[in-house]
């Protein structure tokens, strides 16, 4: 029986905290194929700080994720035909019997409920498993405490030092500034 592991997330904007989700996705896959999908969420509602919670479109998230995490470049997928998690599950049903979804704690329960509801209706898998990539510790420093909300706030207030703390070492300072500018323009 063939198995695939997928991660689905907003990554808006990508942060060092997202590497944990990618690492868990790879670890869960073992030798099986795995893919990481940034959602197509863009613009939309405002967060608690009054900023749009999805400042980057999917193609830019893909670009930045690939640049930030080159070890996963071939696993990070930008596919304009996949705009919902249902479409993601439909994509793999012909080639795989089993699928595992890796998601962050903030969306995990919603995804479990939705994906389970639509099995044998919109798509069919013999087994669907779920992996929670973990809960963020808002008080922790570094990747454990990093959130896209913190990054959006740092960008909006032009706090380049704070924004830089949320970036991996693979990103050079000029790229960090470029990403921050993109986030700022998407927040409005």
Language-model features and meaning:
Residues 1-188:
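Nucleotidyltransferase catalytic core that binds NTPs
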